[in-house]
């Protein structure tokens, strides 16, 4: 019988004195109750996703809320049948969201407690999606968008979040005078990014309050106008959002059939994220190219204990071969 697990997604921008010391204390408590997950703590706040059974997660929420700095912290809760994490990490970072402004010769970082976009609830955000005069901008990484996104949302031509400010500046003339609404997984990235857009001179900037995770749970909108699944940074990889008319938009890297199963290329020097069915992962030894499939450090081969002969037979079946220098 599977175990009933709760996954908690949360963040809060709040000044934390001695944040490094608090991170150590936080980790100690989490381990003492058997919680698992990943938490970032910085001078500017806290951002985390954790999982555990009902009793464990309730103890954690009560403990966090007992600190006056986090008394109103909003936990978004998913019910699952298995743990979303295998270990517990609490790390101190300079920022809970790194927008990369100072790294890329932009102005100083944004404080969302001082400057941020207008909060939109799920109903208001759905109305924005249907408004032809509103620009909807996805602020996540490209591989997150490719698994699922809001219908009609712009996919910036970027690899990761830190490249977004430059992309916006390069394309400013396309939507500077329009209403712009942004969204991300749980809201933490949009708090900072929408504030940056306001500072850049955009006159009408909104953000989906609570992120995609909240939109999918809203009893009125029920995730409608979301296509695909939502990428999450834990062992689940993806979660459903649209409970009205769900669709699969991502396609298997190898044969183009509908697929929402993300894997990393088995070549550790490539590590490209691709969609692949279990059948195709086996067939192509999880390699995204002939070079990766035949790489001497192919992780699929190592994980599954394939002999050199077995490996060669897999590749021969798809018209490829192992180079002579690959060891047994």
Swiss-Prot record:
Q: Which residues form a coiled coil?
A: none
Give the annotated active site.
184
**Could you tell me the Gene Ontology terms of the biological process aspect for this record?**
tRNA modification
Check the record and name the InterPro entries matching this protein.
Answer: Rhodanese-like_dom (IPR001763), Rhodanese-like_dom_sf (IPR036873), Rhodanese_C (IPR022111), TrhO (IPR020936), TRHO_N (IPR040503)
Domain Rhodanese: where?
A: 130-224
Q: Which PROSITE patterns match?
A: RHODANESE_3 (PS50206)
* Alphabetically ordered keywords of this record: Oxidoreductase, tRNA processing
Q: Which reactions is this enzyme annotated as catalysing?
A: uridine(34) in tRNA + AH2 + O2 = 5-hydroxyuridine(34) in tRNA + A + H2O
Supply the HAMAP family for this chain. Answer: TrhO
Q: Which family does it belong to?
A: Belongs to the TrhO family.
Q: What name goes with this protein?
A: tRNA uridine(34) hydroxylase
Organism in which the protein naturally occurs: Streptococcus pyogenes serotype M28 (strain MGAS6180)
Q: What is the lineage of its organism?
A: Bacteria, Bacillati, Bacillota, Bacilli, Lactobacillales
């Amino acid at each position: 019988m599977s175990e009933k697990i709760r996954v908690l997604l949360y963040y809060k921008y709040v000044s934390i004195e001695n944040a490094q010391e608090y991170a150590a204390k936080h980790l100690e408590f989490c381990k003492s109750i058997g919680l698992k997950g990943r938490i970032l703590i910085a001078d500017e706040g806290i951002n985390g996703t954790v999982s555990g059974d009902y009793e464990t997660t309730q103890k954690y929420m009560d403990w966090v809320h007992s600190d006056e700095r986090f008394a109103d912290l909003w936990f978004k809760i998913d019910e699952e049948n298995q743990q979303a994490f295998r270990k517990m990490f609490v790390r101190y970072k300079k920022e809970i969201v790194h927008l990369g402004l100072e790294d890329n010769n932009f102005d100083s970082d944004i404080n969302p407690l001082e400057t941020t976009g207008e909060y939109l609830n799920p109903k208001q955000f759905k109305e924005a999606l249907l408004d032809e005069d509103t620009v909807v901008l996805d602020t996540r990484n490209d591989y997150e968008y490719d698994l699922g996104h809001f219908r009609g949302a712009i996919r910036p031509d970027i690899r990761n979040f830190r490249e977004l400010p430059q992309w916006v500046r390069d394309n400013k003339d396309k939507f500077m005078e329009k209403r712009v609404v942004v969204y991300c997984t749980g809201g933490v990235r949009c708090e900072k990014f929408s504030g940056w857009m306001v500072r850049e001179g955009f006159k009408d900037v909104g953000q989906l309050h609570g992120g995609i995770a909240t939109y999918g749970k809203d009893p009125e909108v029920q995730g409608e106008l979301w296509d695909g699944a939502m990428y999450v940074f834990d062992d689940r990889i993806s979660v459903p959002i649209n409970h009205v008319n769900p669709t699969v938009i991502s396609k298997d890297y190898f044969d183009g059939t509908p697929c929402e199963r993300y894997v990393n290329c088995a070549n550790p020097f490539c590590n490209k994220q691709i969609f692949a069915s279990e059948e195709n992962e086996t067939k192509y030894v999880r390699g995204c190219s002939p070079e990766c499939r035949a790489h001497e450090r192919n992780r699929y081969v190592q994980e599954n204990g394939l002999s050199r002969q077995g490996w060669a037979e897999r590749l021969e079946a798809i018209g490829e071969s192992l180079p002579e220098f690959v060891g047994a």
